[in-house]
Regions:
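Non-catalytic connector elements of ABC transporters
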Residues: 1-68
Length: 68
């Protein structure tokens, strides 16, 4: 499926926590972890499970950078 977002990060789901409305998905991308918050419905429709190979798609308008 073609997307306009240019930042595609292939990885493996390390953790998923489904709440009533949202799901927190932790994806290992190389040495790093990327966390995504998606709707519970989307997580269920994609049948996401720990160990699944997925791609994190990042849009530049949705990324913030903070310096400790």
């Amino acid at each position: 499926m073609p997307l306009s977002a240019r930042n595609h990060l292939p990885g493996v789901i390390e953790e998923i926590q489904r709440d009533t409305i949202i799901a927190h998905v932790v994806i290992r991308v190389g040495e790093h972890l990327v966390e995504s918050v998606i709707t519970r419905r989307s997580a269920d429709e994609l049948a996401l499970e720990v160990g699944d190979h997925v791609t994190a798609v990042v849009k530049a308008t949705e990324v913030m950078v903070a310096k400790p």
